[in-house]
Amino acid sequence: MALAVALSSPSLASADDLAALSRDFWIWRAATQPITRDDLPRADRPHGWAPDWSAAAVEGRRTRLASLTARWQALADARAPTARQVDHRLLGSGLARVRWELDGVASWRRDPGFYVDQTVGAVVDVLLPPPPFDRDRARDLVARLRAATDILTAARANLSDARAPFARLAIADLDGIGPRLQTATAAVALQLPPGSAPTLGRDTEAAVAALEAYRAWLQTRVGAMPEEVAVGREAYLRFLREVALIPFTPEELLAMGRQELARAVAFQAYESARDRGAPELPLVPDQAAQIALAARDEQAIRAYLADKSLLTVPADIPRYVYRKLPPWLMALRGFGEETDFASLSRANEGSTRWIPAPTKDLGFFALSMAQDPRADTVHEGMPGHAFQVALGYRHPDEVRRHWYDSGVNEGLGTYAEEMMLQAGLFDDSPRTREMIYRYLRLRALRVEVDVQLALGGFTIAQAAEYLQSAAEVDARTARDEAAGFAATPGFAIGYVVGKLQINALLAAAARQQGPRFRLQEFHDFLWLNGNVPLSLQRLELLGDTSELKALDGQPRIP
C-alpha cells in the first residue's frame, strides 16, 4: 500500500478506532494464524482451538481480510501524530502478512509440510510451555489430536500446487511418526489431571492413522509434482515492501550479506590468531550444571547491562531459564522450536529454553549452549528475544505488543550478540568470542541462501550444501535451515539485514542528536519497539521518511 494512500486521507484517524482495529485483528489472528516452526509468533489461541484449512475456512479468511483492510484504509491520515502513523502502517504490515500467507508464499497450496505443522506442530505448540498441565491444556491437546483427520483431508484438496522438494521433506519428517507421537502423549498423560483426557489414547491412534495415511498419499504423488520451490522475484519484492517493510532490492540484500560475511570471516580469523593456544571450551557435565550456569549467567548479563549503561532492564522482568527437555518434547524434536517465549496472557511467566543432555554430537547451536550458555542467552534470552518480547507485552501502545515480522526481532537478537561482544562480556572467554563470530558468519550466509532460494538460484539441496561447507555446521543443521528458509522466504535475511538497519539507525541518531545522544536511551527505545520494523522506527525516532518512500517506489536520497 503506497505511503501516499496511508498518509493522505483528509479524515482524522482516531487512536481509539486504530486500537479497536488492532484488537479485532489480533483476536481474529489468534483463531486463524497458521502454526509455524518460528518461536516468536506466540499466539494466545482460544481454548479448544484447532487449525482449520477447509475450503470454507480459507474463504472466511479472505472475507474477513477484505473487511479489516477496508477499515484500515479508512483510518489513513497524514495529519495524525507520527506515532499513530507508525501504528497504522504497522497494522498494514499485519494485514499484508495474511495476504502473503494466502496468495504469496501460499504454503497451504504449495507445501505438504505446512500440514505437518498444523497437526504435529499444533500438538507441540500445546506441549511447549512448562508444566503444570491443567484441564484446559488437556482439552487443547485432545482437540488438536482430533482435528488431524479433518486437517489432512483438507490438505489433499488444497495442495493443488504442491512442490516435490517440500513433499519429500514432509515424507521424511513423518517417517516413524506413530511411535513418536504415541511416546509423547503417553509421557504427557502422566502429567495431566486425573480424568481430564480419558480418550487421549484413542485420539492419538486416530491422529497417527491420519498422519501415516497422509504420508502414504504423498508418496504416491510426489513423482508428478514440480521441483521448483522459488516464489519468484515479484512475490519476494512484495513481501519485502508490504510485510517486512525492508526497503532494499534482492540484489542489495545479496551485497549486504556478502559484505557482512567477509567481515565475519575476517574477524573470526583475527580472533583465532589472537586466541592461539587458548584451551577449547569444555562441555558442561550435565543438564543440572548447565541450568545452574545459565541462571548465573543471565543474572550477570543483567548486571553487566546496567554497569555499562547499555540498556535499562526493569527489575520485575521475568527470567530466561533453561529446563531439561522433557520426554513429551524429546519424542517430537524437530517439529517445532524448543523455546517458549510465553505470550500476552502469560507475560509474567518468563521464557523457557528446553535443553537436551550435553553430548559432543549435539547440533551446532545446542553444542555451543552446552559449552557457554551466554552465547545463546544474549540472542535468545537477555538482552535478546525473551527480554524484547517481555517488554513488548508491556508496551503502553497495544498495537505494538504483537509480532508482525521476524526481521526486526532477529536483527535485534543478532545486534545484541555483537553489542555484548564489543562491550566486553566475553573478554574472559576467547573461544566464546570465536563462537560469536561463527554465529555472525552463519547469519550472513543465511542472506545468500534466503534470496537465492526465493529467486530460484539455489535448490534446497544446494542451499544445505552451501551452508554446511561455508558455515562449517553439521549436516542436520544445514538441512533443517535450508528446508525452513525455502518454506519461509524473507525470514532468514532478518538476522543480518535487521542488524545493519539498527547500526544505520544508531549512526543517524548519533549524528542528528550530537552531544545529546545517549546509547542507553537509544537502546531503550529500540528494545521497547522491538516489534516495529526499523523503517518505521526511523520515522518515529528521526522523522526520516526516506526508507518508507523507498518502499513505495520513490528513489532513496543518500
Model-based region annotation:
Residues M1-S9:
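Bacterial N-terminal signal peptides
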